Structures are given as C-alpha cells and as structure tokens.
Amino acid sequence: LVVRALRPAPPGFDPRREARWRVYRYRILMNGTRRPLERHRTLEIDDRLDVEAMRAAAARMVGERDFASLGSHVHGRTVRHLAEVRVTRRGDLVDVRVTANAFLRRMVRSMVALLLEVGRGRLAPDGVDRVLAGNARALHGRAAPPRGLTLERVVYEAAGQSNQGTPESTTT
C-alpha cells in the first residue's frame, strides 16, 4: 500500500460514490509455474493461454454498455463505462488491468473468467459480444477466484478539474 497524498475530505464526502475511475488488476501465472510467495495474490493455472486472443476479446469489452451478464445479484443500473481492458504478458505472468467508472459485484472476476475461456480456446474472441448481449449471467455464474484480484487505484476528481479523461490523465 502506498499513500501518495493525504488531504482532508469535504463534509459529506462519499468515497464510493465520488470516485471517477477504479483500476483493478488480475494476475494469472500460466504453464504450471508456481511462485509460493505470490500464491495468495496470483491465480496459478496449468494451461498455456493464447494472450493475443485474450487481447482481442478484451478490446470488445471497452466502452459504455450494459454489463448485467457479468455481474452477480444485479439490482439497479448495470450500464458501466470501461475505459480500458489491457492484457499484458511477461514470461508466464499474464496481467489483466481493467479501468472503469464503476463495477458490478464480481464483474472483474467474471470478465477474467470469460477471458480465460478465450485464452484456453474454448470461446472465440467475438463470443464476448454474445455474452455481453445476453441478460443471463455469463458462464453459468462462474467467476475467476478472488486470489488474483487487486484494487490497484481509485481516482477522484481534483479541485478545478473537469469530469473528463481517464486515470492516466487525472490526479489521484
């Protein structure tokens, strides 16, 4: 945990509702590689993933759309704006980084489960479109395990800034 700045919050400040962007990271260690010191924050799988196919599928998730099929116990508004879904690979480590204005419960883990299906060759990248178009819960409610998920960053609007841009262009 790193604290980069500390300021008093205005009266009535609600950190959940006033966040502009949230960034989650999900770590996957593939090919049977094991790192005992990281096992509580990394999903370890035996499969080799097609990272290029995962990137193609991730690109189809970006934008403003209804994500009801990727949330659990969905109540209320289910439209979210995904600014970025980035899949990167370094050796056997695959990182999925998701930036959005808000998330539904279990949404990121469901997105990762969907990307894992693509990476394993069980679903074509364009299959993501069909999943997102459906109102039923994707993958029969399955989500990736929580151990790979980390809330990496929350961005709040700084005084005097407009409500535009992504986390990379704003102050935290």
Labelled PLM ranges:
Residues 1-172:
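Structured-RNA-binding interfaces characteristic of tRNA pseudouridine synthases
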